[in-house]
Protein backbone atom coordinates (compact mmCIF):
# COMPACT_ATOMS: atom_id res chain seq x y z
CA UNK A 1 0.00 0.00 0.00
CA UNK A 2 1.29 3.45 -0.87
CA UNK A 3 2.38 5.70 2.04
CA UNK A 4 0.27 8.60 0.78
CA UNK A 5 -2.89 6.55 1.35
CA UNK A 6 -2.04 5.90 5.01
CA UNK A 7 -3.33 9.27 6.19
CA UNK A 8 -6.39 10.57 7.93
CA UNK A 9 -9.20 11.68 5.63
CA UNK A 10 -9.43 15.40 4.89
CA UNK A 11 -13.08 15.05 3.89
CA UNK A 12 -15.85 12.55 3.26
CA UNK A 13 -18.50 12.43 0.54
CA UNK A 14 -21.99 11.88 1.94
CA UNK A 15 -23.88 10.03 -0.80
CA UNK A 16 -27.25 10.85 0.77
CA UNK A 17 -30.52 8.94 0.73
CA UNK A 18 -30.51 8.44 -3.04
CA UNK A 19 -27.88 8.65 -5.76
CA UNK A 20 -30.52 9.37 -8.42
CA UNK A 21 -30.52 13.11 -9.30
CA UNK A 22 -34.17 13.03 -10.43
CA UNK A 23 -35.24 12.18 -6.85
CA UNK A 24 -33.41 15.07 -5.19
CA UNK A 25 -36.14 17.70 -5.71
CA UNK A 26 -38.77 15.41 -4.21
CA UNK A 27 -36.53 14.52 -1.26
CA UNK A 28 -35.70 18.19 -0.64
CA UNK A 29 -39.39 19.19 -0.61
CA UNK A 30 -40.35 16.28 1.64
CA UNK A 31 -37.61 16.78 4.24
CA UNK A 32 -37.92 20.57 4.19
CA UNK A 33 -41.62 20.27 5.08
CA UNK A 34 -40.90 17.64 7.74
CA UNK A 35 -38.16 19.79 9.27
CA UNK A 36 -40.40 22.88 9.29
CA UNK A 37 -43.22 20.97 11.02
CA UNK A 38 -40.71 19.54 13.52
CA UNK A 39 -39.30 22.98 14.39
CA UNK A 40 -42.71 24.61 14.88
CA UNK A 41 -44.17 21.67 16.81
CA UNK A 42 -41.30 21.21 19.25
CA UNK A 43 -40.76 24.93 19.87
CA UNK A 44 -44.49 25.36 20.59
CA UNK A 45 -44.33 22.51 23.13
CA UNK A 46 -41.29 24.08 24.85
CA UNK A 47 -42.86 27.56 24.93
CA UNK A 48 -46.24 26.31 26.16
CA UNK A 49 -44.67 24.35 29.03
CA UNK A 50 -42.33 27.22 29.94
CA UNK A 51 -45.09 29.85 30.04
CA UNK A 52 -47.90 27.87 31.73
CA UNK A 53 -47.10 27.48 35.45
CA UNK A 54 -49.64 24.63 35.73
CA UNK A 55 -47.34 22.54 33.55
CA UNK A 56 -44.28 22.98 35.77
CA UNK A 57 -44.40 19.33 36.85
CA UNK A 58 -41.94 16.44 36.35
CA UNK A 59 -43.95 14.94 33.47
CA UNK A 60 -43.92 18.17 31.46
CA UNK A 61 -40.35 18.96 32.49
CA UNK A 62 -39.26 15.71 30.83
CA UNK A 63 -41.48 16.44 27.82
CA UNK A 64 -39.93 19.91 27.37
CA UNK A 65 -36.46 18.35 27.50
CA UNK A 66 -37.50 15.69 25.00
CA UNK A 67 -38.80 18.38 22.62
CA UNK A 68 -35.55 20.33 22.95
CA UNK A 69 -33.44 17.23 22.29
CA UNK A 70 -35.62 16.20 19.31
CA UNK A 71 -35.20 19.69 17.84
CA UNK A 72 -31.41 19.54 18.27
CA UNK A 73 -31.13 15.96 16.98
CA UNK A 74 -32.98 16.79 13.76
CA UNK A 75 -31.18 20.14 13.34
CA UNK A 76 -27.82 18.38 13.56
CA UNK A 77 -28.55 16.24 10.48
CA UNK A 78 -31.43 17.50 8.32
CA UNK A 79 -30.22 21.03 7.33
CA UNK A 80 -26.89 19.65 6.05
CA UNK A 81 -28.79 17.10 3.96
CA UNK A 82 -31.10 19.83 2.59
CA UNK A 83 -28.09 21.94 1.56
CA UNK A 84 -26.55 18.91 -0.18
CA UNK A 85 -29.79 18.18 -2.04
CA UNK A 86 -30.16 21.81 -3.12
CA UNK A 87 -26.56 22.57 -4.12
CA UNK A 88 -25.26 19.12 -5.05
CA UNK A 89 -22.29 19.61 -2.70
CA UNK A 90 -21.95 16.33 -0.83
CA UNK A 91 -18.53 16.89 0.74
CA UNK A 92 -18.05 17.33 4.48
CA UNK A 93 -14.67 18.02 6.07
CA UNK A 94 -13.29 15.49 8.53
CA UNK A 95 -13.50 17.88 11.55
CA UNK A 96 -17.11 18.81 10.65
CA UNK A 97 -17.91 15.11 10.28
CA UNK A 98 -16.59 14.41 13.79
CA UNK A 99 -18.54 17.38 15.19
CA UNK A 100 -21.77 16.17 13.57
CA UNK A 101 -21.09 12.66 14.86
CA UNK A 102 -20.47 13.98 18.39
CA UNK A 103 -23.72 15.94 18.58
CA UNK A 104 -25.73 13.16 16.94
CA UNK A 105 -24.71 10.69 19.65
CA UNK A 106 -24.87 13.32 22.40
CA UNK A 107 -28.51 14.14 21.68
CA UNK A 108 -29.37 10.54 20.78
CA UNK A 109 -28.22 9.26 24.19
CA UNK A 110 -30.15 11.99 26.02
CA UNK A 111 -33.24 11.24 23.92
CA UNK A 112 -33.13 7.52 24.71
CA UNK A 113 -32.71 7.89 28.47
CA UNK A 114 -35.27 10.71 28.83
CA UNK A 115 -37.90 8.46 27.24
CA UNK A 116 -37.09 5.88 29.95
CA UNK A 117 -37.32 8.57 32.65
CA UNK A 118 -40.77 9.50 31.35
CA UNK A 119 -41.86 5.85 31.65
CA UNK A 120 -40.64 5.74 35.26
CA UNK A 121 -42.51 8.99 35.96
CA UNK A 122 -45.75 7.38 34.67
CA UNK A 123 -45.02 4.27 36.77
CA UNK A 124 -44.70 6.31 39.97
CA UNK A 125 -47.78 8.42 39.14
CA UNK A 126 -50.00 5.37 38.57
CA UNK A 127 -48.55 2.79 40.98
CA UNK A 128 -47.52 5.11 43.85
CA UNK A 129 -49.76 8.20 43.54
CA UNK A 130 -49.62 9.09 47.25
CA UNK A 131 -45.81 9.24 47.20
CA UNK A 132 -45.47 10.80 43.73
CA UNK A 133 -44.64 14.34 44.91
CA UNK A 134 -41.97 13.03 47.27
CA UNK A 135 -40.35 10.59 44.82
CA UNK A 136 -40.53 12.72 41.65
CA UNK A 137 -39.64 16.18 42.91
CA UNK A 138 -38.71 18.79 40.31
CA UNK A 139 -35.34 19.25 42.01
CA UNK A 140 -34.55 15.54 41.62
CA UNK A 141 -35.70 15.60 37.99
CA UNK A 142 -33.41 18.55 37.23
CA UNK A 143 -30.48 16.73 38.86
CA UNK A 144 -31.20 13.56 36.88
CA UNK A 145 -31.40 15.41 33.56
CA UNK A 146 -28.25 17.42 34.37
CA UNK A 147 -26.36 14.21 35.18
CA UNK A 148 -27.68 12.64 31.98
CA UNK A 149 -26.40 15.53 29.84
CA UNK A 150 -22.97 15.26 31.52
CA UNK A 151 -22.90 11.46 31.01
CA UNK A 152 -23.90 11.86 27.36
CA UNK A 153 -21.16 14.44 26.83
CA UNK A 154 -18.55 12.02 28.21
CA UNK A 155 -19.73 9.02 26.14
CA UNK A 156 -19.97 11.03 22.90
CA UNK A 157 -16.52 12.54 23.44
CA UNK A 158 -15.08 9.05 23.97
CA UNK A 159 -16.63 7.93 20.66
CA UNK A 160 -14.96 10.85 18.87
CA UNK A 161 -11.55 10.30 20.49
CA UNK A 162 -11.65 6.64 19.44
CA UNK A 163 -12.68 7.67 15.92
CA UNK A 164 -9.94 10.32 15.65
CA UNK A 165 -7.18 7.72 16.05
CA UNK A 166 -8.27 5.79 12.93
CA UNK A 167 -6.64 5.96 9.52
CA UNK A 168 -8.73 6.08 6.33
CA UNK A 169 -7.57 4.96 2.92
CA UNK A 170 -9.23 4.17 -0.37
CA UNK A 171 -12.77 5.43 -0.89
CA UNK A 172 -14.07 8.27 1.29
CA UNK A 173 -17.65 7.90 0.05
CA UNK A 174 -20.13 7.38 2.89
CA UNK A 175 -23.41 5.65 1.87
CA UNK A 176 -25.42 7.79 4.29
CA UNK A 177 -26.80 11.33 4.61
CA UNK A 178 -24.89 12.21 7.80
CA UNK A 179 -21.77 11.10 9.65
CA UNK A 180 -22.62 8.13 11.85
CA UNK A 181 -20.19 5.74 13.50
CA UNK A 182 -20.87 2.50 11.64
CA UNK A 183 -20.71 3.81 8.02
CA UNK A 184 -17.49 5.72 8.78
CA UNK A 185 -15.88 2.72 10.51
CA UNK A 186 -16.38 0.66 7.35
CA UNK A 187 -14.04 3.05 5.49
CA UNK A 188 -11.15 2.67 7.92
CA UNK A 189 -8.17 0.55 6.92
CA UNK A 190 -7.02 0.14 10.54
CA UNK A 191 -8.34 -2.10 13.32
CA UNK A 192 -11.76 -0.86 14.49
CA UNK A 193 -12.46 -3.62 17.04
CA UNK A 194 -12.12 -1.25 20.03
CA UNK A 195 -14.60 1.16 18.43
CA UNK A 196 -17.10 -1.60 17.70
CA UNK A 197 -16.85 -3.08 21.20
CA UNK A 198 -17.41 0.37 22.71
CA UNK A 199 -20.44 0.91 20.45
CA UNK A 200 -21.97 -2.36 21.71
CA UNK A 201 -21.25 -1.48 25.36
CA UNK A 202 -22.79 1.98 24.97
CA UNK A 203 -25.78 0.59 23.05
CA UNK A 204 -26.36 -1.84 25.90
CA UNK A 205 -26.24 0.98 28.45
CA UNK A 206 -28.28 3.65 26.66
CA UNK A 207 -30.61 1.64 24.41
CA UNK A 208 -31.12 -1.90 25.76
CA UNK A 209 -31.12 -1.01 29.48
CA UNK A 210 -33.60 1.91 29.19
CA UNK A 211 -35.81 -0.23 26.94
CA UNK A 212 -35.89 -3.06 29.51
CA UNK A 213 -36.67 -0.51 32.25
CA UNK A 214 -39.55 0.84 30.14
CA UNK A 215 -40.95 -2.67 29.63
CA UNK A 216 -40.69 -3.37 33.37
CA UNK A 217 -42.38 -0.05 34.22
CA UNK A 218 -45.27 -0.66 31.85
CA UNK A 219 -45.68 -4.26 33.02
CA UNK A 220 -46.19 -2.91 36.56
CA UNK A 221 -48.47 -0.16 35.23
CA UNK A 222 -50.60 -2.72 33.37
CA UNK A 223 -51.02 -4.81 36.53
CA UNK A 224 -52.00 -1.67 38.49
CA UNK A 225 -54.48 -0.55 35.81
CA UNK A 226 -56.22 -3.93 35.74
CA UNK A 227 -56.89 -3.55 39.47
CA UNK A 228 -58.72 -0.23 38.96
CA UNK A 229 -62.42 -0.98 39.59
CA UNK A 230 -63.99 1.63 37.31
CA UNK A 231 -63.85 1.46 33.50
CA UNK A 232 -63.42 5.24 33.39
CA UNK A 233 -60.36 5.06 35.63
CA UNK A 234 -58.79 2.35 33.49
CA UNK A 235 -59.49 4.33 30.32
CA UNK A 236 -57.89 7.47 31.79
CA UNK A 237 -54.78 5.53 32.85
CA UNK A 238 -54.45 3.85 29.44
CA UNK A 239 -54.88 7.23 27.74
CA UNK A 240 -52.08 8.70 29.87
CA UNK A 241 -49.67 5.96 28.79
CA UNK A 242 -50.68 5.36 25.16
CA UNK A 243 -48.95 8.44 23.73
CA UNK A 244 -45.68 7.58 25.46
CA UNK A 245 -45.86 3.97 24.29
CA UNK A 246 -46.22 5.21 20.69
CA UNK A 247 -42.99 7.21 21.07
CA UNK A 248 -41.24 4.20 22.64
CA UNK A 249 -42.24 1.99 19.69
CA UNK A 250 -41.08 4.57 17.12
CA UNK A 251 -37.74 5.38 18.74
CA UNK A 252 -36.54 2.05 20.12
CA UNK A 253 -37.94 0.04 17.22
CA UNK A 254 -35.43 1.73 14.91
CA UNK A 255 -32.42 2.35 17.19
CA UNK A 256 -32.31 -1.26 18.41
CA UNK A 257 -32.27 -2.41 14.79
CA UNK A 258 -29.33 -0.14 13.92
CA UNK A 259 -27.06 -0.45 16.97
CA UNK A 260 -27.82 -3.91 18.40
CA UNK A 261 -28.48 -6.05 15.31
CA UNK A 262 -25.55 -7.88 13.64
CA UNK A 263 -24.00 -5.85 10.81
CA UNK A 264 -24.57 -8.80 8.45
CA UNK A 265 -28.34 -8.37 8.89
CA UNK A 266 -28.37 -4.57 8.51
CA UNK A 267 -28.24 -3.42 4.89
CA UNK A 268 -27.41 0.14 3.82
CA UNK A 269 -31.03 0.75 2.81
CA UNK A 270 -32.35 -0.45 6.20
CA UNK A 271 -29.72 1.63 7.99
CA UNK A 272 -30.74 4.82 6.16
CA UNK A 273 -34.47 4.10 6.57
CA UNK A 274 -34.02 3.59 10.31
CA UNK A 275 -31.97 6.79 10.58
CA UNK A 276 -34.74 8.75 8.84
CA UNK A 277 -37.18 7.44 11.46
CA UNK A 278 -35.24 8.66 14.50
CA UNK A 279 -33.71 11.83 13.03
CA UNK A 280 -36.74 13.17 11.12
CA UNK A 281 -39.99 11.24 11.53
CA UNK A 282 -39.99 10.71 15.32
CA UNK A 283 -38.98 14.32 16.19
CA UNK A 284 -41.71 15.57 13.84
CA UNK A 285 -44.44 13.28 15.23
CA UNK A 286 -43.66 13.56 18.96
CA UNK A 287 -45.38 16.97 19.48
CA UNK A 288 -48.57 15.64 17.84
CA UNK A 289 -48.48 12.33 19.73
CA UNK A 290 -48.11 14.05 23.11
CA UNK A 291 -50.55 16.91 22.51
CA UNK A 292 -53.48 15.24 20.69
CA UNK A 293 -54.76 13.35 23.75
CA UNK A 294 -53.52 15.74 26.44
CA UNK A 295 -56.11 18.34 27.43
CA UNK A 296 -53.74 20.32 29.67
CA UNK A 297 -51.14 20.65 26.93
CA UNK A 298 -53.73 21.48 24.27
CA UNK A 299 -55.11 24.18 26.56
CA UNK A 300 -51.64 25.64 27.10
CA UNK A 301 -50.98 25.62 23.34
CA UNK A 302 -54.28 27.41 22.68
CA UNK A 303 -53.41 30.06 25.27
CA UNK A 304 -49.99 30.52 23.68
CA UNK A 305 -51.41 30.90 20.16
CA UNK A 306 -54.17 33.27 21.35
CA UNK A 307 -51.59 35.36 23.19
CA UNK A 308 -49.49 35.68 20.03
CA UNK A 309 -52.55 36.61 17.95
CA UNK A 310 -53.67 39.21 20.53
CA UNK A 311 -50.20 40.77 20.81
CA UNK A 312 -49.81 41.02 17.02
CA UNK A 313 -53.25 42.60 16.43
UniProtKB/Swiss-Prot annotation:
Protein name: Olfactory receptor 1M1
Function: Odorant receptor.
Entry keyword set: Cell membrane, Disulfide bond, G-protein coupled receptor, Glycoprotein, Membrane, Olfaction, Receptor, Sensory transduction, Transducer, Transmembrane, Transmembrane helix
Primary location recorded for the protein, binned into one broad class: membrane
This protein's record includes keyword S-adenosyl-L-methionine: no
Top-level lineage group: Eukaryota
Cytoplasmic topological segments: 50-57, 121-139, 220-236, 293-313
Amino acid sequence: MEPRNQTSASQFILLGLSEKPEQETLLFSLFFCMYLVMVVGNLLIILAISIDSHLHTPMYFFLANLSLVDFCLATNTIPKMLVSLQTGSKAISYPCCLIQMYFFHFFGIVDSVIIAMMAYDRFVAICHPLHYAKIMSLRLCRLLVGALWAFSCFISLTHILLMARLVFCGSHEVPHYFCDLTPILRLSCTDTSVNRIFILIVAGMVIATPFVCILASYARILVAIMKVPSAGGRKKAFSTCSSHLSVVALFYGTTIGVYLCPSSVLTTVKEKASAVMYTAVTPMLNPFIYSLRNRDLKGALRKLVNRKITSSS
